[in-house]
């Protein structure tokens, strides 16, 4: 892999996202967005990856990511998603959801639309109204789904002032993240280790399926769906474990993979090469998981700068009887036969790596050490 380039940006980065390339386009992405948190003034920013430069004083490569534009954001940026080429949706710790519009002609961002009280607490234990953080968003034009600390799920449509659908008491605990399983189904993860599937075609406030971690009810912080096999879902939790789920069968994960030493903040399947998966953690690490069958001799060791530590996997379900070619490499991982290769992508441990995104050969991540890291050569 080409060197990973760092740029120090004087703000803690909570979210990083590549701008999608137009469908059918052969170009690689050039632009990414970031959101910040825990700063005196937070903002949403757009960057161009530009040229990569020289060695810095620490011996690392200094990236020449150019700031295109930024705009103030009220509250911490809890999540960030591109809605389309021009619009970015941001979730705030104030409970507000904002759509920002990028104007490429003069390189500015403006507020395009806003739902100021998408998430809020009510009831005897809170004032008659108090804001609740919006913790996660997912977009599928023209729809935006949001989840929050208030256990509420909202379905918004761009250009509609009010929510199209709200499930007020979707969860009695905090919802941490959401993604589409297949339209109009979504999957959410919560603070008591549950993965729930919701179908917007059904009325009422009950999920159509609940899966959960057995035992300790470890909070789940992140979720992603396999881009080709929509029944395969990955989650990461407070204990740093990576869980792989098959929502067609059972109520527990298919496999649990021992991973980070602290909270896993994000997990992403590579959108066009989903045998590759990426995770980042509070422990300051960013990992590339390779489950592809054509990888060289698989090793059960985790490689990082000459050090290795053992890698643990145990499968919780038997895949017998399922035609092997139809089984995702993530479901067929038998530790006795297959190995998943894990590579640490950052040159050294840092403060929390809060967010990552992958698109084509490009990866970006953001940290509490006020740095953004980028590589454009993931698989070389």
Curated annotation (Swiss-Prot):
One of its GO terms (cellular component) is nuclear speck. Pfam families: WD40. It comes from the Eukaryota. It is found in: Chromosome, Centromere, Kinetochore; Nucleus, Nuclear pore complex. Gene3D superfamilies: YVTN repeat-like/Quinoprotein amine dehydrogenase. WD repeats lie at residues 8-57, 72-110, 119-166, 170-208, 215-255, 259-299. One of its GO terms (biological process) is protein transport. Keywords: Acetylation, Cell cycle, Cell division, Centromere, Chromosome, Chromosome partition, Kinetochore, Mitosis, mRNA transport, Nuclear pore complex, Nucleus, Protein transport, Repeat, Translocation, Transport, WD repeat. The modification N-acetylmethionine is found at residue 1. Component of the Nup107-160 subcomplex of the nuclear pore complex (NPC). The Nup107-160 subcomplex includes NUP160, NUP133, NUP107, NUP98, NUP85, NUP43, NUP37, SEH1 and SEC13. Component of the Nup107-160 subcomplex of the nuclear pore complex (NPC). The Nup107-160 subcomplex is required for the assembly of a functional NPC. The Nup107-160 subcomplex is also required for normal kinetochore microtubule attachment, mitotic progression and chromosome segregation. This is Nucleoporin Nup43.
């Amino acid at each position: 892999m080409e060197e990973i380039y760092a740029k120090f940006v004087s703000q803690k980065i909570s979210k990083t996202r590549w701008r999608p390339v137009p469908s059918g386009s052969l170009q690689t992405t050039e632009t990414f967005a970031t959101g910040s948190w825990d700063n005196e003034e937070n903002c949403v920013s757009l960057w161009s990856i530009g040229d990569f430069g020289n060695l810095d004083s620490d011996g690392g490569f200094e990236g020449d990511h150019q700031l295109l534009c930024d705009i103030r954001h009220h509250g911490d940026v809890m999540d960030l998603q591109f809605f389309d080429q021009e619009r970015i949706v941001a979730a705030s710790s104030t409970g507000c959801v904002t759509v920002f519009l990028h104007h490429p002609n003069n390189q500015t961002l403006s507020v395009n639309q806003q739902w100021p009280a998408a998430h809020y607490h009510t009831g005897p234990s809170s004032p008659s109204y108090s804001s609740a953080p919006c913790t996660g968003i997912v977009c599928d034009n023209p729809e935006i789904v949001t989840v929050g600390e208030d256990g509420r799920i909202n379905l918004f449509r761009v250009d509609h002032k009010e929510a199209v659908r709200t499930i007020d008491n979707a969860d009695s605990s905090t919802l941490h993240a959401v993604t589409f399983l297949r339209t109009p189904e979504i999957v959410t993860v919560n603070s008591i280790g549950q993965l729930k599937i919701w179908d917007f075609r059904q009325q009422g406030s009950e999920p159509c399926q609940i899966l959960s971690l057995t035992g300790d009810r470890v909070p789940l912080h992140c979720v992603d769906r396999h881009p080709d096999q929509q029944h395969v879902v990955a989650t990461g939790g407070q204990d740093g474990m990576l869980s792989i789920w098959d929502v067609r069968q059972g109520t527990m994960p298919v496999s649990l993979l021992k991973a980070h030493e602290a909270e896993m903040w994000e997990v992403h399947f590579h959108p066009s090469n989903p045998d590759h998966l990426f995770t980042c953690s509070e422990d300051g690490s960013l990992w590339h998981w390779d489950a592809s069958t054509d990888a060289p001799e698989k090793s059960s060791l985790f490689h990082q700068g000459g050090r290795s530590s053992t890698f643990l996997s145990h499968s919780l379900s038997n895949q017998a009887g399922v035609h092997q070619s139809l089984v995702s490499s993530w479901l067929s991982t038998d530790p006795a036969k297959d190995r998943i290769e894990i590579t640490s992508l950052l040159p050294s441990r840092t403060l929390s790596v809060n967010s990552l995104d992958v698109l084509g050969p490009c990866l970006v991540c953001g940290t509490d050490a006020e740095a953004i890291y980028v590589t454009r050569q993931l698989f070389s």
